[in-house]
Amino acid sequence: MTNIRKTHPLTKIINNSFIDLPAPSNISAWWNFGSLLGICLIIQILTGLFLAMHYTSDTATAFSSVTHICRDVNYGWIIRYMHANGASMFFICLFLHVGRGLYYGSYMFSETWNIGIILLFAVMATAFMGYVLPWGQMSFWGATVITNLLSAIPYIGTSLVEWIWGGFSVDKATLTRFFAFHFILPFIISALAAVHLLFLHETGSNNPSGIPSDSDKIPFHPYYTIKDILGALFLILTLMLLVLFSPDLLGDPDNYIPANPLNTPPHIKPEWYFLFAYAILRSIPAKLGGVLALVFSILVLAIIPLLHTSKQRSMTFRPLSQCLFWLLVADLLTLTWIGGQPVEHPFITIGQLASILYFMILLVLMPIISIIENNMLKW
């Protein structure tokens, strides 16, 4: 009798995706982040669902409802901080996942890569709208500043901003719609993640060598299920250490002050995971130029496959490209630091140089270095 796991229409899909899936025998821990992102998404949906049961999306009561969750709801504080810090863990895993894709040439699977970029935009939009919901000072002013960027769009800009706001400023209508979108987007992200996996399973996983691994496959279960469980334990341990010992480490103290349209905080800045993009936005004096640079800082990933000039897929055996890659990582860390600094003399210049270097590495230096490496190897 054939195993029901392999024949039943429902279990067959699960079996072919997570159990009998042929996987390369040499994929490293850098391939764990896909499953970790799935776990992050599940944690965020579950904690978010329980928060939504007690949260009220009204300007008069939003801040108080979050306080009520932390003080009066059973284990409300842990749910709230798991959700807030879960977002940080989500973005750490996202950045490492994208970095892995860049390093090992996984972007050559163009459909998977492009769905991944759409997912990145969707997660960033969700996180931004979620940050507005507690209705603290940074929530209000962050929402005002970021939505205002759309007014840089010629001709329709101002009307577009007022349409998004549902009025002439960030107010009750804005908060209500942001809550609605923040609630629905994670489910859209789940569907997109399924499509992301669907396209990945059309080609099979890449591996650290960048060489096709069809001749050397192993079943996903038990080898990679156990490896993913280990990664998940590390993820949950890190998250719980953050939640239980320093839940406000990555947050902004200004968000514990209720939103006040008459009082602007001294330094308006987004959460840490947006600081690199915020630094790029601020480094260009023109409003429209800044907005375009901001969007292109993520959208640039879409043209990476077109700029792949190397004869090898992965950077494993390409030391010059490796140096450039780690320079890019250092540059992104610099941008993150600059994004959190005030707009003053040394920081402005550093931010502008780091922004230029970011685009230079991805669009100019990487393709040139790859050609040089090809010639060095006489390929």
UniProtKB/Swiss-Prot annotation:
Disulfide bonds: none annotated. Heme b b562 binds at residues 83, 182. A ubiquinone binds at residue 201. One of its GO terms (molecular function) is ubiquinol-cytochrome-c reductase activity. Pfam families: Cytochrom_B_C, Cytochrome_B. Its cofactor is heme b. It comes from the Eukaryota. Heme b b566 binds at residues 97, 196. It is found in: Mitochondrion inner membrane. The keyword Protein biosynthesis does not apply. Component of the ubiquinol-cytochrome c reductase complex (complex III or cytochrome b-c1 complex) that is part of the mitochondrial respiratory chain. The b-c1 complex mediates electron transfer from ubiquinol to cytochrome c. Contributes to the generation of a proton gradient across the mitochondrial membrane that is then used for ATP synthesis. The cytochrome bc1 complex contains 11 subunits: 3 respiratory subunits (MT-CYB, CYC1 and UQCRFS1), 2 core proteins (UQCRC1 and UQCRC2) and 6 low-molecular weight proteins (UQCRH/QCR6, UQCRB/QCR7, UQCRQ/QCR8, UQCR10/QCR9, UQCR11/QCR10 and a cleavage product of UQCRFS1). This cytochrome bc1 complex then forms a dimer. This is Cytochrome b. It comes from Mustela altaica (Mountain weasel). The gene is MT-CYB.
